[in-house]
Amino acid sequence: MKKSVNLLSGGIDSATVLAIASEMCYEIHAMSFNYGQRNHAELQKVKELIKKYNVKQHKIVDIDLRAFGGSALTDDNIDIPHYHSINELPEIVPVTYVPARNTIFLSYALGFAEVIGAQDIFIGVHTSDSANYPDCRPEYIKSFEKMVNVATNMGIQGKKITIHAPLIDMTKEQIIRTGLKLGVDYKNTISCYTPTEDDLSCGNCLACIIRLDAFKKNNIQDPIKYV
């Protein structure tokens, strides 16, 4: 059985990608990160996901990205913006962008993949994010894949490492539709940047607005609870 390393955050996208990798019959090795983010609830949500998809092993890596901040998710001095509708969302890189986060995460996943001999790495980047987050674009994924195959022992031995981004051409609406077909229980996910201590989502941060809009377009009630 082929091995995969799946980046798993506890949100809609990574949960859907986990289901896709499971459907493709990979032996899944998941990796999550405690990087100093405001939303620690996402690390609790992954527990149910790894049970459902028979994840072989799950690594939670501690990284202190608060050490240099630069993002509303890792710096308490930067406020999380709140919105009333999807039409208010910014068309520029938002303050919730974490500098180089996907590059850092993929680098850890790459190291893990080399250790266990996995040639497939899965990440949940997609179209809806690519407009605002530079490390969610197709050209970024292609460039990273090219780099890893000249920078690793596996790569120079001809054991090509592939970075899979199966959601790359999908909107959030399409991602949810795909996940539902695969049986993903989105009750076990969270997207909110500032959930309460009892895991209630705020409903008006960028992530919540996009999530609620996507469920609405699918004519489905979001199964998680909001304030």
Swiss-Prot record:
Cite the NCBIfam families for this sequence. 7-cyano-7-deazaguanine synthase QueC
Give the UniProt keywords, A-Z: ATP-binding, Ligase, Metal-binding, Nucleotide-binding, Queuosine biosynthesis, Zinc
Q: What gene name is given for the protein in this entry?
A: queC
Q: Name one Pfam family in it.
A: QueC
Q: Does the keyword Metal-binding apply?
A: yes
Give the protein's biological function.
Catalyzes the ATP-dependent conversion of 7-carboxy-7-deazaguanine (CDG) to 7-cyano-7-deazaguanine (preQ(0)).
Instruction: Report the cofactors.
Output: Zn(2+)
Q: Signal peptide location in the record?
A: none
What does the entry comment about cofactor binding?
A: Binds 1 zinc ion per subunit.
Family stated for the protein in its record = Belongs to the QueC family.
Residue ranges of coiled coil: none
- EC no.? 6.3.4.20
Q: Where does ATP bind?
A: 8-18
Hydrolase listed as a keyword = no
* Name used for this protein in its record: 7-cyano-7-deazaguanine synthase
- List the catalytic activities from the record: 7-carboxy-7-deazaguanine + NH4(+) + ATP = 7-cyano-7-deazaguanine + ADP + phosphate + H2O + H(+)
GO terms of molecular function: ATP binding; ligase activity, forming carbon-nitrogen bonds; zinc ion binding
A GO BP term here is: queuosine biosynthetic process
Its pathway?
Answer: Purine metabolism; 7-cyano-7-deazaguanine biosynthesis
**Species of provenance:** Rickettsia typhi (strain ATCC VR-144 / Wilmington)
Residues that, per the record, bind Zn(2+): 192, 202, 205, 208
